[in-house]
Amino acid sequence: MKKVFLLYILFIELIFGGCQNEDNSANTIGEHKNVPDYTPSSEDVVDMHGEIKNKERFEVFLNNVEKGNNDSIRVVRYTEEGDPMLHDLEYDGEVIKSTTDTRRDKFGAGSISNATCTSAEIVETTERTEYVLEGCDNTIDNIILVTWK
């Protein structure tokens, strides 16, 4: 009887052991190979869950765009889990080149998207102020930054 019971346990272990997947995709969601580490810069505008750091630098960028002066800036938004999502904006005196890099978001799809936009606008509501890109050649999330009132 003991031998039958041990054979039964061994059989069950083989069945469950054979069903295991070594890849375990739950642990690889959002992992992207060959993504360089993000190194923060004192020039970055940082949105940490609604708390904006270095907003003055962002306002200088908007002012330069309005005046037609070349400028570039990086806006970094952090996810709830603390992953940085980078949004690089480069103004060449005519258009704003937007590059959004979400590859470091462990729970997102992770991609790099590019767009060329004609302007940056300020949209005021009673609850918040949105800074958005306008006249973009690609369908993108055109919100650069949001400040809450």
For each of these PLM feature ranges, what is it?
Residues 29-38:
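Immediate post-signal-peptide N-terminus of mature secreted/exported proteins
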Residues 1-4:
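Positively charged n-region of N-terminal signal peptides that target proteins for export
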Residues 40-122:
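Mature extracytoplasmic domains of secretory-pathway proteins
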Residues 20-22:
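Bacterial signal peptide processing site
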